[in-house]
Amino acid sequence: MALSILNQFYLSCNAMAVVELYTDGASSGNPGPGGYGAILKFGQHEKELSGGYRRTTNNRMELMAVIKGLEALTKSGLDVVVTSDSKYVVDAIDKGWLFGWEKKGFKDKKNPDLWRRLLVLLRKHHVKFKWVRGHNEHPMNERCDELAVAASKVYNLPEDTGYGE
């Protein structure tokens, strides 16, 4: 039985190599229709992921891009470098805010449903975050933006059930 391209991609990953995850989120209005785009890269292998919701925010889509990218990894304990143009996401991790928010039960914080999902994934892998300036000719960031914007324009998008929590 032939392996799907996605399975071939993930079976080739091992804990000794670094998986690169590029992400971006977009929304038309805040809230409004939004989308996320992610690119997983390992050696010569590359996989694009995208999706959207009809009523969401740009920050939720930035988070969703990272979450969907990490959820796509079928092995645990991988070294992953996430490259994002979202200060919201990168600073929450790199400055340790997320772990403080968790200790306080995410009291008065937006998007607790997504932050909780991200925490589970951060504990499953060895993840480092890298910030890049958005819309600054970074090819992978630009491609993720294209994926996110296209996903936000799909007809009959599903509801973002966590929005508004």
Spans of features found by a protein language model:
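RNase H catalytic domain
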Residues: E20-P33, I67-R143, L147, S152
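RNase H-like nuclease fold core
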Residues: L11, A15-M64, L70-L78, A150, ...
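N-terminal amphipathic/basic-hydrophobic helices that include classical n-h-c signal peptides
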Residues: M1-A15
